[in-house]
């Protein structure tokens, strides 16, 4: 994989301050069964190269799917031309930044390779789909299976070489029930494929996908006759498949350093977080410990090196409630330091494909487990709601004021779980919400989750992220139902 690219690339490198080649090849297969009928399979092979050139302070890049010598030569020339055009006109002197010079390999650990034929995969999905139709009020249901194999090569003019291979699996299942003019849906892991992980067939067993159809359908039917979630100030216990969204929107996006520096302000927005907050800001209660951890082998966004070549390592983003680090990669950290801000970042510069430039992204952003069991958290609540599975979200362009909804809730009264409620929602402000964190679940309440659909950037990039979290209890939260 490396020999032909490396030799050709190094022959063509111009006399510049920095030049890199990043090759990406993805092979994916998406299979789906809807209402027991297989849908057309979608298979794709996508490959190409991104060239980056830094010279005399300018920064340029160019991508091509033509990986021949002439294609590489043309891409290098275009990237060099953009570097010349941006020299002295950019937000920073890029030649002043020291880029990583990595060397290494990484491969997703796979315990059980997926050896099933396409027919066998469809049969598995049809069996799970058939289990969903437990009542005539079930009007729509589907099961799907998405696998991706990715190969990457990163080479620089100064001798860096990194090879990485990843295997991703995304199982999904959803059910919709309808009666008396109302529809309610339940999904396995959420609408955005929360049980996605790296690995092989072991993910299916680990996620609990087999046998999930009947339970998911039963819960959709229960929601049809459930009362609306009550409104008012009360305690909330969020399970991991909602914590995933809470972490993503009100910790992950606000802490992306390029957003803090203003790069996204006219598109995806800014952040309520400012550079002077790092090291002192009380982001959450002392129970809040958030880590960036691309080293967790089976989590969705694990890797050994980011797309600028920075080595992956676990780091605390928030420790005992105090904001410590930003989600910023090599270049953004250097830009912040050039402005006089001595912030620390992580190895999180990533792109979604060969035809996009790397930018600051979430990777695996996790809440560390605490000491409380789920039973202890429930027992501590006088009045509240336990909520599962994200359904909807709305958050302002500084990632501060938010309103989130879940698929299903369960009342808690006097320390006991009560009946199911539908349309549970809550609202808050990121800058203060995490200070209401009152209990953090132990490892028995933790789920390792993620999503393939985190969007950001111009042109748009949709990337994989991971979120592992225990169940968490928050006090005095503004809760409301669909009529609230």
What do the PLM-derived regions correspond to, one by one?
Residues 62, 67-92, 166-259, 324-325, ...:
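Internal alpha/beta scaffold segment
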Residues 17-49, 138-162, 380-406:
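Structured beta-strand/loop patches that form or line metal/cofactor-binding pockets in enzymes
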Residues 6-10, 16-29, 74-165, 199-241, ...:
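Acidic low-complexity segments
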Residues 31-36, 149-167, 183-191, 245-252, ...:
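Short acidic, glycine/serine/threonine-rich loops at helix termini
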Residues 43-55, 163-194, 316-319, 406-414:
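Short beta-strand elements
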Residues 22-34, 96-101, 144-151, 229-243, ...:
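A glycine-rich phosphate-binding loop feature that marks nucleotide/adenosyl-phosphate handling sites
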Residues 105, 266-484:
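Dual-mode signal for accessory low-complexity, basic/Gly-rich regions
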Residues 29-84:
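N-terminal alpha-helical targeting/anchoring segments
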């Amino acid at each position: 994989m490396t020999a032909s690219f490396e030799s050709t690339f190094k022959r063509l490198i111009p006399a510049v301050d920095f030049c890199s080649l990043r090759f990406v090849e993805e092979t994916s297969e998406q299979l789906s069964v809807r209402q027991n009928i297989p849908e057309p399979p979608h298979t794709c092979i996508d490959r190409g190269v991104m060239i980056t050139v830094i010279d005399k302070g300018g920064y340029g890049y160019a991508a091509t799917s033509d990986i021949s010598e002439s294609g590489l030569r043309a891409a290098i020339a275009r990237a060099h031309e953009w570097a010349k055009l941006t020299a002295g006109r950019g937000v920073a002197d890029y030649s002043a930044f020291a880029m990583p010079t990595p060397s290494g390999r990484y491969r997703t650990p796979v315990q059980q390779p997926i050896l099933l034929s396409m027919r066998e995969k469809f049969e598995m999905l049809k069996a799970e789909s058939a289990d969903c139709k437990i009542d005539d009020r079930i009007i729509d249901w589907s099961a799907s299976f998405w696998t991706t194999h990715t190969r990457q090569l990163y080479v620089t003019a100064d001798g860096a070489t990194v090879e990485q291979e990843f295997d991703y699996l995304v199982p999904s299942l959803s059910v919709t029930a309808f009666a008396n003019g109302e529809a309610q849906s339940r999904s396995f892991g959420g609408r955005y494929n929360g049980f996605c992980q790296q690995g092989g067939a072991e993910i299916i067993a680990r996620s609990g996908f087999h046998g999930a159809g009947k339970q998911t359908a039963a819960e959709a039917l229960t929601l049809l006759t459930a009362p609306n979630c009550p409104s008012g100030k009360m305690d909330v216990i969020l399970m991991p498949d909602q914590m995933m969204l809470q972490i993503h929107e009100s910790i992950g996006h606000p802490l992306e350093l390029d957003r803090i520096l203003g790069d996204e302000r006219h598109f995806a927005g800014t952040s309520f977080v400012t550079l002077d907050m790092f090291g002192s800001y009380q982001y959450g209660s002392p129970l809040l410990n958030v880590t960036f951890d691309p080293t967790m082998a089976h989590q969705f966004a694990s890797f050994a090196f980011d797309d600028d070549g920075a080595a992956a390592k676990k780091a605390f983003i928030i420790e005992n409630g105090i904001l410590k680090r930003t989600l910023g990669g090599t270049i953004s950290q250097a830009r912040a330091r050039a402005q006089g801000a001595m912030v620390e970042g992580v190895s999180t510069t990533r792109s979604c494909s060969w035809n996009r430039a790397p930018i600051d992204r979430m990777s695996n952003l996790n809440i560390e487990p605490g000491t409380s069991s789920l039973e202890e958290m429930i027992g501590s609540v006088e009045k509240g709601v336990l909520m599962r599975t994200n359904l909807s979200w709305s958050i302002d362009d500084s990632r501060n004021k938010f309103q989130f909804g879940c698929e299903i809730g369960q009342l808690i009264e006097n320390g006991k779980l009560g009946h199911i409620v539908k349309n549970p929602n809550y609202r808050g402000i990121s800058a203060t919400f995490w200070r209401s964190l009152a209990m953090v679940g132990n490892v028995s309440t933790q789920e390792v989750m993620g999503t393939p659909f985190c969007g950001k950037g111009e042109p748009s990039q949709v990337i994989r992220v991971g979120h592992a979290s225990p169940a968490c209890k928050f006090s005095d939260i503004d809760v409301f139902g669909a009529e609230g």
